């Protein structure tokens, strides 16, 4: 599965619990977006970044 380029966040597995306490497997997926970023050496690269890292300004988008 895909992971965030910055924080390496990826899908995790858990259970969904119904009102009658039945448990079903499910997947919690991060909100990954494909963005073109500027690398430290000045080049650009298209990577998958989670929205939490985008909002925090941990990457510089290439325009």
Swiss-Prot record:
Belongs to the bacterial ribosomal protein bL28 family. One of its GO terms (molecular function) is structural constituent of ribosome. GO terms for cellular component: ribonucleoprotein complex; ribosome. It holds the Pfam family Ribosomal_L28. PANTHER family: 50S RIBOSOMAL PROTEIN L28, LARGE RIBOSOMAL SUBUNIT PROTEIN BL28A. It comes from the Bacteria. This is Large ribosomal subunit protein bL28. The gene is rpmB. SUPFAM superfamilies: L28p-like. One of its GO terms (biological process) is translation. HAMAP family: Ribosomal_bL28. Keywords: Ribonucleoprotein, Ribosomal protein.
